[in-house]
């Protein structure tokens, strides 16, 4: 790997169309006015969030004078960002937040440049790849040290081309508290074995974590998850239309859960919920539409479960 210096030169490629394009997030620009010089196709420009890019490929060079401590919103809604190879030279060792770093980068397909990033001090990964709708695999993240991560919410929300999450297999998420909407809308994701040994014991918010994962049919990898600290399970598996068997959740400790609204709503393949009878939901307050539009379930089955739960 090339040596990372105090001053970094980062080359990026954007695909322009002779119109005003957003290439950086406003918050990132405001915070780095004095730290970054910008060159577009070789010409120095003022650092702002929008530019009129010529039709075709445009070269954007960033000259970063000092180590960045906050990459939040750096490429927020940069829909024409095509190539980030230059980011492999970016020194991230001081960074604590990657919130919405690539949010809405819908043309981004390759994140190999990030594989050697030092993320050991990052606590906030919220929405980092949200809306990266062309991203199909994240193997490049397999060696990331995310042990200090606390917020993983919305991290891959809307990554509708994502089919392979093996890069997350060895992640240490033991400090993670927020996992809400982490994979929401990953409609092609069918294999979540990479999550089998995740330590989510510190997690309290699982709302909509797998919402609209319409290809997900096997949740056995979640069988041994310790969700005892979880209080919000609202919509966690809502619209998982291929999910027929929730037996793996039989021994989940949800005794601290207070929100179960829409948890399995529109799971149109779901046929059996008897295994949930062992759940302790004594602290639950919201159960509205928990199984709404589960067309293969009978009302009598749902009523029987609720009677067992005494709600």
Which residues does each PLM region occupy?
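Negatively charged
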Residues: 1-311
């Amino acid at each position: 790997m090339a040596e990372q210096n105090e001053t970094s030169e980062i080359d990026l490629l954007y695909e322009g169309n002779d119109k005003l394009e957003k290439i950086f997030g406003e918050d990132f620009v405001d915070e780095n006015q004095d730290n970054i010089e910008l060159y577009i196709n070789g010409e120095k420009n003022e650092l702002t969030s929008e530019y009129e890019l010529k039709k075709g490929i445009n070269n954007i060079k960033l000259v970063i004078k000092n180590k960045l401590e906050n990459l939040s919103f750096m490429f927020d809604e940069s829909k024409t960002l095509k190539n980030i190879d230059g980011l492999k030279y970016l020194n991230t060792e001081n960074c604590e937040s990657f919130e919405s770093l690539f949010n809405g980068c819908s043309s981004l397909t390759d994140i190999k440049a990030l594989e050697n990033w030092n993320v050991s001090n990052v606590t906030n990964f919220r929405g980092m790849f949200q809306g990266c709708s062309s991203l199909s695999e994240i193997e490049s993240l397999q060696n990331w040290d995310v042990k200090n991560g606390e917020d993983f919410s919305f991290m891959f929300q809307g990554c509708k081309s994502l089919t392979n999450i093996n890069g997350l297999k060895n992640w240490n998420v033991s400090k993670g508290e927020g996992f809400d909407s982490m994979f929401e809308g990953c409609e092609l994701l069918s294999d979540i074995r990479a999550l089998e040994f995740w330590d989510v014991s510190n997690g309290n918010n699982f709302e909509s974590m797998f919402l609209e994962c319409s290809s997900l049919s096997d949740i056995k990898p979640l069988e041994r998850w310790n969700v005892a600290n979880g209080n919000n399970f609202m919509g966690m598996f809502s619209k998982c239309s291929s999910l027929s068997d929730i037996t793996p959740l039989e021994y989940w400790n949800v005794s601290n859960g207070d929100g179960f609204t829409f948890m399995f709503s529109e799971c149109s393949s779901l046929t059996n919920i008897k295994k949930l009878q062992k759940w302790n939901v004594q602290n639950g307050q919201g159960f509205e539409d928990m199984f709404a539009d589960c067309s293969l379930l009978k009302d009598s089955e749902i009523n029987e479960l609720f009677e067992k739960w005494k709600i």
